[in-house]
């Protein structure tokens, strides 16, 4: 029975340990069938909060001139938010980010994807330097290793720029721990990490309870899973940031 979602999802998540991407594929198919059976788009069934969402455009870590070219092209294409990837060279990261800010101007929102590249102390030093130089980054994603929650909290407590937990969160329990310990300011939800929409909705409920905003992102995925993420983003008011390109 397609309307017995809880039972279906309990069986799905009990069927195998880990493998969240495989679970997500089944989860999304179930929710798609659920919505089609009701004759409504999925985002309306899940909450229907928004008619429009705005995604950031990812700028991959490359030589400075290539990152500048990609950033300017994204702005020319109409993107108002850039998600800029960092590397493993602190001075080069600072140089690249400041060069991009200067090139695109103050009207473009810039988010920093640190991708676990820095130590806690290095992260504080880099982010503080960027703050002092007027970078005005909207946020920094996962500045330290996913398992280093003590380090994540250290960074969050020592900088002004909001810190996002990404790879540190796979489940509602992970999100609850991060929020209760104030280890990060924001939560990044990815359906390939959570095992699909069902667990992502639980994370949204926790975030809403504590008044914490969420971002929704993606990995290297098909348009099917990215579309599912877009529906979830449109459904929930707690998802205030989108990074699906």
Positions of PLM-derived features:
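Metal- or metallocofactor-binding catalytic centers and their adjacent structured scaffolds
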Residues: 1-37
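Catalytic core of soluble alpha/beta enzymes
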Residues: 84-225
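Gly-rich Lys/Arg/Thr-decorated short loops/hinges at beta-loop-alpha junctions or inter-strand turns
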Residues: 50-55, 74-81
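Active-site beta->alpha loop and helix N-cap motifs at the rims of alpha/beta catalytic domains
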Residues: 40, 57-69, 73, 90-94
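A generic structural signal for well-ordered alpha-helical segments
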Residues: 34-35, 156, 207, 233
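Flexible C-terminal active-site loop/helix
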Residues: 219-245
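Flexible, glycine/charged-enriched surface loops at secondary-structure junctions
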Residues: 2-6, 41-45, 137-143, 218-219
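N-terminal small/glycine-rich loop or linker at the start of catalytic domains
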Residues: 36-61, 96
């Amino acid at each position: 029975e397609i309307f017995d979602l809880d039972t279906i999802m309990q069986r799905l998540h009990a069927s195998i340990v880990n493998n969240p991407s495989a679970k997500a594929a089944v989860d999304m198919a179930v929710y798609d069938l659920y919505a089609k059976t009701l004759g409504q788009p999925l985002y309306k069934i899940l909450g229907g909060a928004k008619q429009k969402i705005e995604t950031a455009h990812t700028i991959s870590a490359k030589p400075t001139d290539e990152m500048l070219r990609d950033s300017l092209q994204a702005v020319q294409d109409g993107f108002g938010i850039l998600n800029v990837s960092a590397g493993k060279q602190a001075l080069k990261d600072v140089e690249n980010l400041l060069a991009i800010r200067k090139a695109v101007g103050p009207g473009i929102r810039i988010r920093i994807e640190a991708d676990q590249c820095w130590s806690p102390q290095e992260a504080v030093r880099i982010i503080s330097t960027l703050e002092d130089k007027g970078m005005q980054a909207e946020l920094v994603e996962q500045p330290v290793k996913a398992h280093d929650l003590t380090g994540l909290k250290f960074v969050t407590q020592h900088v002004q720029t909001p810190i996002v937990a990404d790879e540190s969160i796979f489940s509602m329990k992970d999100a609850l721990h991060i929020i209760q310990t104030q280890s990060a300011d924001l939560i990044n939800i990815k359906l390939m990490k959570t095992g699909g929409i069902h667990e992502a909705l639980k994370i949204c409920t926790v975030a809403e309870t504590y008044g914490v905003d969420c971002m929704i992102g993606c990995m290297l995925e098909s348009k099917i899973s990215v579309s599912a993420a877009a529906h979830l983003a449109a459904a929930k008011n707690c998802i205030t940031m989108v990074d699906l390109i």
